[in-house]
Amino acid sequence: MAQLYFYYSAMNAGKSTSLLQSSYNYRERGMNTLVMTASIDDRYGKGKVASRIGIESDAQVFSSHDNLIEMITAAHQENHLSCVLVDECQFLSKEQVKQLTYIVDKIDIPVLCYGLRTDFQGELFSGSHYLLAWADKLVELKTICHCGRKANMVVRLDGEGKVMREGEQVAIGGNESYESVCRKHFREFIWD
């Protein structure tokens, strides 16, 4: 029986690496996967999922208005899918998370979602909110703060490396723009 998984973490915990490894494991056994990523994140090129350790895969891109049932069923009819893997799932809409539950419940294809839990102000992303509510399995991927504690929050940095307290929820960037920190340091940077 298929399930909906949400693998979440702060930045730099290996979410994309884990997604690419899972896809590889299926493919190595002769099974087809569909790798998807949000169109808003084009750091590694449009239609690519890439890891900081240097591995990458082509991916089908989705925007917040796309119907994932249509996209996935079309891919399933073309290549019988054994698994769907979604990177940057924090950018999913509520309706799209609901559509992924349909893929799992009605079409019986496992869906593995990978993304951030919260933004740089400690607020849930929409996709993460509904995945936390509706996923069958929640898996936290861990990374560490500069102090050695588990990092479960993210802070945004300006061009000079200073922590930003305000701004748009979504600003695409990597290590130059974000730092994963523990809640204690998040509190010092953002709340205090």
Swiss-Prot record:
Catalytic activity: thymidine + ATP = dTMP + ADP + H(+)
EC number: 2.7.1.21
Keywords of this entry: ATP-binding, Cytoplasm, DNA synthesis, Kinase, Metal-binding, Nucleotide-binding, Transferase, Zinc
Chief subcellular location: cytoplasm
Binding site for ATP: S9, A10, M11, N12, A13, G14, K15, S16, D87, E88, C89, Q90
Intrachain disulfide bonds: none
InterPro entries in the cross-refs: P-loop_NTPase, Thymidine_kinase, Thymidine_kinase_CS
A single GO molecular function term of this UniProt record: ATP binding
GO biological process: DNA biosynthetic process; thymidine metabolic process
Localisation: Cytoplasm
Family that this chain belongs to: Belongs to the thymidine kinase family.
PANTHER family: THYMIDINE KINASE, THYMIDINE KINASE, CYTOSOLIC
HAMAP family tied to this protein: Thymidine_kinase
Protein known as: Thymidine kinase
One cellular component (GO) term of this entry: cytosol
Enzyme class per UniProt: transferase
Subunit (UniProt): Homotetramer.
Pfam family, one: TK
Domain of life according to the entry: Bacteria
Active-site feature positions: E88
Residues bound to Zn(2+): C145, C147, C182, H185
